[in-house]
């Protein structure tokens, strides 16, 4: 006999399947509702252009990568990484592994190569326990790693898009990003659930 679902997980499932973005994603054959978040960010911030090389961290199931390939065209390239498996997408070079593992990071950097990239984006999040004092530090660790990679591989003028959960360490992290980019915005896309602490920092114009 299966375990009874908790009230919170049952509520999440109910919200998930009644969510208009989930329904639209299913109708359009999209990987996830995250596609709509990035579409809204692109509409306001014009991050992606044809021919770009983009790094996608926390890529599975592929909503962001799926969106980006429509924006960067045949001459563009997406290098994606996730702990979870992801079905292939044309134009996406996917590496499955834990981004926190030095060997995985080295393999990812090898795929990036010597040329700088135009965008680093991260939708990474830890498995949430529901306890902010546990979840926020875990999430901040991931976004710090994403920022370190952005510093290493972004070309001058490049952009960084990162999901961050508001809480302890957020203001300090935002300050670090502002020191490296000429323009920094905080976005809460309509497709992001209102109850969620998540926001997206959109940083453009990586300084020399």
From Swiss-Prot:
GO terms for cellular component: cytoplasm. CDD domains: AdoMet_MTases. Keywords: Cytoplasm, Methyltransferase, rRNA processing, S-adenosyl-L-methionine, Transferase. Belongs to the class I-like SAM-binding methyltransferase superfamily. RNA methyltransferase RlmE family. One of its GO terms (molecular function) is rRNA (uridine-2'-O-)-methyltransferase activity. The lineage of its organism: Bacteria, Pseudomonadati, Pseudomonadota, Gammaproteobacteria, Enterobacterales. S-adenosyl-L-methionine binds at residues 62, 64, 82, 98, 123. It holds the Pfam family FtsJ. Specifically methylates the uridine in position 2552 of 23S rRNA at the 2'-O position of the ribose in the fully assembled 50S ribosomal subunit. It comes from the Bacteria. This is Ribosomal RNA large subunit methyltransferase E. Its EC number is 2.1.1.166. PANTHER family: RIBOSOMAL RNA METHYLTRANSFERASE, RRNA METHYLTRANSFERASE 2, MITOCHONDRIAL. Its main location: cytoplasm. It is found in: Cytoplasm. It catalyses: uridine(2552) in 23S rRNA + S-adenosyl-L-methionine = 2'-O-methyluridine(2552) in 23S rRNA + S-adenosyl-L-homocysteine + H(+). The active site is at residue 163.
